[in-house]
């Protein structure tokens, strides 16, 4: 998911 992706982790 996004929480594991550094490109969108800031959204978590």
From Swiss-Prot:
Tissue note: Expressed by the venom duct.
Cellular component GO terms, alphabetical: extracellular region; host cell postsynaptic membrane
Modified residues (4-hydroxyproline): 6
Localisation: Secreted
Function, as annotated: Alpha-conotoxins act on postsynaptic membranes, they bind to the nicotinic acetylcholine receptors (nAChR) and thus inhibit them.
Swiss-Prot/TrEMBL domain comment: The cysteine framework is I (CC-C-C). Alpha4/3 pattern.
Protein name: Alpha-conotoxin-like Reg1b/Reg1c
Source species: Conus regius (Crown cone)
